[in-house]
Structure formats: C-alpha cells, structure tokens
C-alpha cells in the first residue's frame, strides 16, 4: 500500500514522495495538500473524479498546475472529472460541459462555449456579468446581482431565482421549471 501511495504521489507531482508521505498536512503547502488529495482519490482507479473547489485558496501558478494535472489525468486514465467551483475562470479553462446551479438546482446546462457566449437563464447571464474584465474601464463598478440568496430551507415550488430576476413571470413563482433535454435553461422567460 505504501509503495502504491508513493507511486501515485509521484504521478501527481509531489516532490520527494517518500518523505512527504510521512509528513502531516500542516507540513505541506496548499498545492501539495491538493495533489495528495488527488492521489488518494486515484487509489481505487475511479472512472469519475469529483473535484469540489480544487483550486480554492491556491495562488494562480499552483492553480494552473492543478488544472493541468486534472486535464492530464483525465486524458491518460480515461477519467471523467466533475468539477464543482464558483470560479468561472476555472470553468472556462477546463470544462467541456457546464451545469449552472442556483439555490441547489440546475438552472442551465450546455457546452462551455454556449454557456459563456450565449447564456439563456437570467442567473447565468448575471453571473457572467459579475466577472471582472480587462476590456472594461478601470473605474467602472462591477456588476452585482440585487437581492439575497435563498436560505437552504427555502423550498419554493417555482424558480429559486424568481425574487431576483427581472424577467420573471407569474409561472416562475408557482410552477417548477424543468430543464429541456440535455442542454438548455430551466426558465419560462429564457434570454
């Protein structure tokens, strides 16, 4: 088991894996801890790797290395990666297909290209508008989405984004909205 751990630690780019394997987490950098977590996830040779916020609290250089590692592992091992993140830059960098969630529900699904170029759900559009962009004037204020996120206990029947949406209609408040097929938006008034 130890030799397999060393092999996987080496594969994910941890230097001196024989030494690092005996260290405690606080003795490792954030990037090494993330690599160790990825190595431990690969022990059982999964077909799917669920990566929940894999780049949070990492500097930009280490973040790029972790994304590159996930991409390489996906190709080499035939591994699907389910990436859970709030970082739309990470989504743009690594994802093929995207599911946008709001309040615990999927509100839009599509290819990364379609989601970024032509969002159909008002939340997706507003989410993308909040991203800082280099082509905007420096003094321009960042876009914010008005209102509050629903509490986890709020189990409204309709769209959870309804109170914050400028395109909402009566049906949005009362009726559950289903995603149409594989791609599309769960919205009565899509863009």
PLM regions and their residue ranges:
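Conserved ABC ATPase signature
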Residues: 23-28, 32
């Amino acid at each position: 088991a130890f030799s397999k751990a060393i092999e996987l630690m080496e594969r994910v780019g941890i230097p001196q894996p024989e030494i690092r394997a005996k260290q405690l987490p606080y003795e490792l950098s954030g990037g090494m801890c993330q690599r160790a977590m990825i190595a431990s996830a690969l022990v059982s040779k999964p077909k799917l790797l669920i990566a929940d916020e894999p780049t949070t609290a990492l500097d930009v250089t280490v973040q790029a290395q972790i994304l590159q590692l996930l991409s390489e592992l996906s190709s080499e091992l035939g591994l699907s990666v389910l990436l859970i993140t709030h970082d739309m830059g990470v989504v743009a960098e690594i994802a093929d297909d995207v599911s946008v969630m709001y309040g615990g529900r999927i509100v839009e699904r599509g290819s990364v290209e379609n989601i970024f170029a032509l969002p159909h759900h008002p939340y997706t559009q507003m989410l993308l508008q909040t991203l800082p962009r280099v082509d905007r004037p420096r003094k321009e204020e960042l876009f914010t989405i008005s209102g509050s996120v629903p509490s986890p206990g709020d189990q409204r029947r309709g769209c959870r984004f309804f109170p914050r949406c400028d395109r909402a209609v009566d049906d949005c408040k009362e009726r559950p909205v289903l995603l149409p097929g594989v791609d599309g938006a769960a919205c009565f008034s899509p863009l």
